[in-house]
């Protein structure tokens, strides 16, 4: 489930002038996607606030992230916000506070295929690993 699409389809949050969604986390939690008999993967930058069995946080070196966001024509303020968030472990910290099992993966030097394989392996083994990626040198 792509969480951004799910929120738009289910009218969770308010669309801002810049096209981004402003989302009330409690509203999202009350309306989160439900798994049927099979497991589902929920992908999105707010997914770590949901009630999950397992949470994987993908990490990227802040300088690499800045290059990628520049290539996607993100605004300077949005790039800065994302880079600072990554460097300060914001999503990881929130995931650790909200989830029982967290696994982080540094994707900086990995291909999408390598990341996919690592995610599958982590899910199958229910591994837990957090706090192994450190970007404090960025500042």
Question: What role is predicted for each listed range?
Answer:
Residues 40, 55-57, 102-104:
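Short, well-ordered beta-strand core segments
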